[in-house]
Amino acid sequence: VQDAQVKSMISAGLEVISCGANVPFADKEIFLGPGAEFADCEVSVIPDFIANCGMARVFRYLMNDNIPITDEAIFKDVASCISNALAEVYKVNPSKINISRTALEIAIKKLLK
């Protein structure tokens, strides 16, 4: 997605971008390039490492012993992971913008611990 497309979607009422498996912005940078940064400053952008954590979380869940292996249990675990991540971002930044920047800063701090 390029800046002009983001601007067009914003003018049509876009409020949220939930990134999928790959960063959707036409940036050379993997994390928060100029296009992603522009969108993050204009609308709520949920970064791919939160929005698309499902399969990684399912694998982690299934590696546990003595757990229920049902659609409901797996969905509940993934939903809880996403909800907790967004709640953590909201504690640091209760704004509707700069969600990706805040989430990335939190993730980097955790990795550096």
Please annotate each region the language model reported:
Residues 13-113:
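Adenosine-phosphate binding glycine-rich loop
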Residues 1-4, 11, 19:
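Rossmann-like NAD(P)-binding element
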Residues 2-6, 26-27:
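Cysteine protease catalytic core and zymogen-processing segment of caspase-like enzymes
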